[in-house]
Amino acid sequence: MPEAPPLLLAAVLLGLVLLVVLLLLLRHWGWGLCLIGWNEFILQPIHNLLMGDTKEQRILNHVLQHAEPGNAQSVLEAIDTYCEQKEWAMNVGDKKGKIVDAVIQEHQPSVLLELGAYCGYSAVRMARLLSPGARLITIEINPDCAAITQRMVDFAGVKDKVTLVVGASQDIIPQLKKKYDVDTLDMVFLDHWKDRYLPDTLLLEECGLLRKGTVLLADNVICPGAPDFLAHVRGSSCFECTHYQSFLEYREVVDGLEKAIYKGPGSEAGP
């Protein structure tokens, strides 16, 4: 019996490995997240290798080609169109973005902190609604994403309101008072690693950056989820919580945002 060609054996082996990965994703995440995981961890790296660039660079190039310079709304629409029609990306998106807009307009923060800039979508979205003199500090750990965020912010015409800081949130947060002249924060938008939501919330409080009335708005608390953060803010009398059910960006997968208004450390006391 003739032996199978090595290339064929390699292809079969790779197919089996990918099938196992898909089944594991399906078991732990369900179909919605499974498809996203398959795209992000399997198809996307292959696409990047073939194209010679990254998805984030392709999003920026699409904006530069199709959006109007200095028009923040045009930038958002270009990103949404690209991510709906061509490649999924982890922006807050248009559906949940409207909820973010409403919270910004309701509370009108003067000093806003964003944890996780990615490609700059939410930074542009929030900065365009800030009052004159208000500012947004956005922290991004990935230098490549930070560079794209800066270009996106510049192109959208909101760079005068946005300060981009490259680094890990747990390293930057303790520097905010002295290095970035922050007394307390009016609002914090959490959209970085979900396992950092709770530690960074505790760190913000420890560093004296939360005041009575500070608004925490956390994305993706259902999908992929931030259960420890939700348990903490909902179970603490220091926070007044509101949940906004919505859908995962550019997908019909249930997700939501959690708004937690800080009531002060003294609110914890009880019988």
Curated annotation (Swiss-Prot):
PTM description: The N-terminus is blocked.
Phosphoserine modifications at: S267
Key word Thylakoid present: no
Annotated GO CC locations: axon; cytosol; dendrite; extracellular exosome; intracellular membrane-bounded organelle; membrane; plasma membrane; synapse
Listed cofactors: Mg(2+)
Family matches, as InterPro entries: Catechol_O-MeTrfase_euk, SAM-dependent_MTases_sf, SAM_O-MeTrfase
Superkingdom assignment: Eukaryota
Residue numbers binding S-adenosyl-L-methionine: V92, E114, S122, E140, I141, G167, A168, S169, Q170, D191
Top EC category: transferase
Cytoplasmic side: 1-6
Cross-referenced PANTHER family: CATECHOL O-METHYLTRANSFERASE, CATECHOL O-METHYLTRANSFERASE 1-RELATED
Protein name (record): Catechol O-methyltransferase
Organism: Homo sapiens (Human)
